[in-house]
Structures are given as C-alpha cells and as structure tokens.
C-alpha cells in the first residue's frame, strides 16, 4: 500500500520486524498499518521518517497507492 515507504525500508536493508522493534511498535500493528487496515498516526509517521533518516517528505513517504 505504501510503495515509497516499502522501497525505502528495502533499500536500507531493514526488516519490518526489526524496524517495528526499534521504533517500539508491535510487529503485527506495523503490518496492519502498512497494509492499510489501520492508519499511521502523525507521531508514528514522523518517528518512522526519522528512523529511516529520510529527506523525503512525510506526504511522499506515506502516499497511498
């Protein structure tokens, strides 16, 4: 669902499980949010952006396709 976010995670070589652990989010919660079953909060989006150390805007990083 979040193609840009998915590609950035893959490019950095980070597993979703590791990212979830590092940002303090339950792995299943992260998967549900990334699949569109629930939405990311602004704080979660900012936290993920900072974790990935991305210059990409939040809007672009979390654009839905």
Which residues fall in each region the model found?
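Residues in the recognition helix of alpha-helical DNA-binding motifs
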Residues: 8, 22, 33
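Short alpha-helical "recognition helix" segments of helix-turn-helix
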Residues: 18-20
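Recognition helix of helix-turn-helix/homeodomain-like DNA-binding domains
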Residues: 25-40
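Short C-terminal boundary/hinge segments that cap the last helix of small helical domains
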Residues: 52-65
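A short, Lys/Arg-rich alpha-helix, primarily the initiator
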Residues: 1-15
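Short, basic-rich loop-to-helix N-cap that marks the start of a DNA-contacting helix
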Residues: 37-49
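Residue-level signal for the short linker/turn that defines the boundary of a DNA-recognition helix
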Residues: 13-14, 40, 56
């Amino acid at each position: 669902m979040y193609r840009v976010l998915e590609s950035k995670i893959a490019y950095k070589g980070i597993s979703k499980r590791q990212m979830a652990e590092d940002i303090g989010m339950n792995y299943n919660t992260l998967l549900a949010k990334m699949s569109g079953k629930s939405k990311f909060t602004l704080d979660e989006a900012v936290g993920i952006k900072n974790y990935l150390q991305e210059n990409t805007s939040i809007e672009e990083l979390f654009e839905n396709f």
